[in-house]
Amino acid sequence: MTPFRFRAVPALLAALLAAPVAAQPSRTSSRPDGENPAAAFAASHSPATSGRHRTSEEEDARRDHAETHRRGFQQHDRPQFVFSSKENRFSFSLGGFVALRAAYDAGGIVENIDFVTYDIPVAGNYATRQKLTLDASTSRLFLKAIANTRAVGRVVIYLDGDFRGGAANSYTPRLHSAYVSLLGLTLGRDVTTFCDLEAAPATVDFQGPNAYNFNFATLVRYERSFAEGRLSFGVAAEMPVVSGTYGEGFDAIPQRVPDIPFYLQYAWGGDRSSHIRASAVVRNMYLHDLTRKSDTSLTGWGVQFSGTIRCCDPLRLFMNGVYGKGITPYIQDLTGSGLDFTPCPRDETRIRTMPMWGWQAAAQIALTPRLFLSGGYSTVRVQRSHGFYAADEYKRGQYVFGNVFYTIAPRCKVAGEYLYGSRRDMAAGKGHANRVNVMLQYGF
């Protein structure tokens, strides 16, 4: 990071053009974004990497932003530039990256920019054999501000977004996160509390393994760690998103009760880079019964076990397993599928939540500090509940991937990936797809 004071803002463009490329710092972990924040700060901001004297305020500002940097699935690198006020009472950073993905589907396609196995056509035809895709809509911008206050200590304000807000290829801006964090509280929009950000490996595919749950929610969350960072827990109230099949006997109405996800995590290792986590979520979904002319509700619930384990210096493992009823927002492949609940096939005046489960496991090996390989398998299944509502209802999806990432320069990387997926319906219809992805990404 190359910090500046507010008074130096007019010289920012000149500094950007004149700044030399720093040597890539050595890693202490096989995870591409898994460095200890304090160690990474010391390595990348030592006097040897600086061309000018830095004040204590600037050092403190960089440390604040390093310590609050979040690592994990689809997270950005630490910012290159940090702006600080006098005595570091307030600082902010700007950053992001430009990402270009190219994909080619053959032997079956996915009707989505991302590799979503739910969207694999079951009855293939001449239009579902091959497809070319070029996409830069996941390029990202972010702003982080940190205030060091006497009353409540450190306050973090964060916003980020990409260009996936409209139809495919429209490049409409989309807000990902917008929250303020203080005293263990997070208020705003962020990744759902049910998601374990470090339980999935890096993928070129923006969607990631189909049993994972990288979704966002508007929330109020409380988190706390203790026992020297070995133990942590979190609980939240999140705005519910219901996706059900109502049939002829029911109708949608506004929701009244937030989803309640919570977790307990145990971490180990010198930098706490390995952990296991147990999570759960409870939901209460409201709908209107047209037959009885009254409102009713269904209870959804889910449990998850997840984690990441650094087995040795170059090898890291990832996994998560989830089971529940009526939890489509918390399983990647089922989000928006209409399977939180469906009418009973024998009596459409009755309705029930759908049981569902999924799991994924992956490994990542760092061949050098700049080069790593990943591979894994993921599957999702929707169980029958007294039969099935429709013959073309989703039953099972499989997601297999292998990739290679190479860091050309500290903020530039390229990657290649192969993906195989399949979808099976309740009535045994099946489709499959193959995709080759390549990516070029440059951060700033």
Residue ranges with predicted function:
Residues 21-108:
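N-terminal periplasmic/intermembrane-space "pro-region" immediately following the signal or transit peptide
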Residues 406-408, 432-444:
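Outer-membrane beta-barrel "beta-signal"
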Residues 10-19:
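Bacterial N-terminal signal peptides
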Residues 83-114, 125-243, 256-257, 261, ...:
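Outer membrane beta-barrel
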Residues 105, 148, 162-168, 194-196, ...:
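Sequence/structural signature of outer-membrane beta-barrel proteins
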Residues 271-387, 391-394:
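Detector for outer-membrane/organellar transmembrane beta-barrel domains
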Residues 139-159, 263-290, 366, 371-378, ...:
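Surface-exposed extracellular loop regions of Gram-negative outer-membrane beta-barrel proteins
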